[in-house]
Amino acid sequence: MRAVQHQPISLLDSWPAPDTDAVHHALREELRRFDRKVVVLDDDPTGVQTVHDVSVYTDWTEETFRAGLESNDRLFFVLTNSRSFSAGETTRVHREIAEHLAAASQKTGVPFVLISRSDSTLRGHFPLETETLRTELEALLPERYDGEILLPFFLEGGRYTIDNVHYVREGDTLVPAGETEFARDTTFAYRASDLTEWCQEKTGGAYPAEQVVSISLDELRRRDYDAVCEKLMGVSGFNKVVVNAVCYDDVAVFVTSYLRAAARGKVFMFRGSAAVVKVLGAVSDQPLLRREDLMCADQRNGGIIIVGSHVRKTTMQLEALQKGCPEIEYICFDVNTVFDDAALAAERRRILDLSLIHI
């Protein structure tokens, strides 16, 4: 396995600054010609955090897919929450999704591109979900998938891909993803930080690292659309494509190249973070929500913050909230009670009684 090192945050500034105006002009031109609906299957509720004014469905019936495909929106989300499923359950659900999506597409005549939105720290049912979707959709529709695009870059969370190595920002340091607590997840553990090796690891060698196609930062910063497009034109057999990115302009250059390859008949599925959804869906930037965006000026009622995660970073965030906002009331749910029906019922009553005191 390739040896990778921690890197200073200054590494992100090692490439020439992108020409943002030129990048987005080219992207708009290609999006204008793109006639496919963007369908986002989200394995966790956090996937909508980079978008706004989009529909989010919480079921995957044929009627739901028809409604999404027939809408005037460029994209829509279907929240599967499948990261919490067993392998068997997510297989069953994704077969059902493929069946209903294929039927809806055939009946509406609306083509689509699929984004399997997942974790920017590489946790999730990969390659199970996208392999299941590919197999089922190819059995139901005439299209054949040439490849799968892996794009886990997520600026807002400090997740960057450089020279195929995926990093997680921790303070002023870029830590290879395989060395973080996320890689030690009890369900989705992995070792490789180089995404080409990660593909080989997660697919059990079905897609060897040396055969995975890589889109470099140098190509993207040069805006070498032709070179990137030709790489995509050469992909077949559902081979994996790793996209390096450290800013949204890098994603935009890649998406422009992808759109040109798609116009020439290439068919890809995406597996990535929320960033690629925002770019391919042409979702505009929007500032963080303010108090006045959420409630009337004279509103005195409070709100509920629900925190639930087993990773250390979330614990640190909660501790910072407790220290900075001592006026908030904190109620801790005893998760160990979920294994006993009577204990769980008692804990539920306790939490409800405590909550009612503060409402």
Task: Give short role names for the model-derived ranges.
Residues 45-47, 81-84, 155, 247-248, ...:
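Short, glycine-/Ser/Thr-/acidic-enriched flexible segments
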Residues 2-27, 109-122, 305-323:
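Short N-terminal secondary-structure initiator segments
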Residues 357-359:
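Conserved small/polar residues in nucleotide/adenosyl-binding loops
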Residues 2-4, 54-55, 60-61, 84-86, ...:
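Long, low-complexity, Lys/Arg-enriched
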Residues 28-42, 52, 68, 72-74, ...:
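Cap/lid and interdomain-hinge subdomains that line or gate substrate/regulatory clefts
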Residues 5-19, 23-24, 30-52, 79-82:
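N-terminal signal-anchor module of multipass membrane proteins
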Residues 165-352:
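Conserved, well-structured core segments that form the ligand-binding/active-site neighborhood
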Residues 48-79:
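N-terminal short beta-loop-beta anion/metal-coordinating cradle
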